[in-house]
């Protein structure tokens, strides 16, 4: 994008609070296109649903969508000793044994926790959530058999799946993945509501002129066609998008509504950032 725009783009990492600190600062930046931020499912959907009392920005009202940079697949996988060998048998086994099996995710009220709860809602099954501090420990325990089921981003689980230490049941991805022959996506398996990959994209503060937004989007599209960028994304298990501001705004709103629905219907208790200093007014 720097080459296409003819000026450098400086990355300033503002970590903490699941991305809330950086997002809050970006939302209050000047509306001139010179301060942008990265949108993720966490910052735009999960945080507002899970942390409604102290989130200092509104993901729908405070930002202008520019474009979705890339999508990454999610996966539900099992320990190889799990009695079912395919997705249909997997769901049948869970329905026959409510509460017997446990699933791991990268943490309470994270994207993958909500994916697991959404799975339970869609399939009418009852599995027990075991939260971990990151995907690494969850993957390790799924491989070791401490938990039977894992909801994860595909790139972090793929090495263990390819090694035969985990068995993929289904993926959240628009099409089949060659390296996972015979593994359906959730839409093919009959649950399109679960067929949601994670994404990350570009945002500007709300009120940024559309000619500026479109210029940024055009530069992103050119960058996403660069073979080096495509390879870098592929190496991390992602695929480029580059959709329009309107299309990306629709994706954000759909994911926002999904997270709100899951948290409400599954009675997931809000978590708090009270130990962190967040800028200005809370999200309402």
What are these regions (language model features)?
Residues 85, 157-226, 254-257:
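C-terminal lobe and pocket-closing loops
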Residues 28-34, 41, 49-137, 186, ...:
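Hinge/capping helix and adjacent helix->loop/strand transition within the periplasmic-binding protein
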Residues 121-125, 162, 187-188, 210-272:
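An extracytoplasmic/periplasmic, membrane-proximal ligand-sensing/linker region
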Residues 274-280:
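Conserved small/polar residues in nucleotide/adenosyl-binding loops
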Residues 1-60, 100, 112, 124-153, ...:
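N-terminal (or domain-start) structured segment
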Residues 13, 38, 105, 167-172:
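Structural signature of the Rossmann-like NAD(P)-dependent dehydrogenase/reductase core
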Residues 1, 112-115, 252-255:
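Hydrophobic/aromatic residues within well-ordered alpha-helical segments
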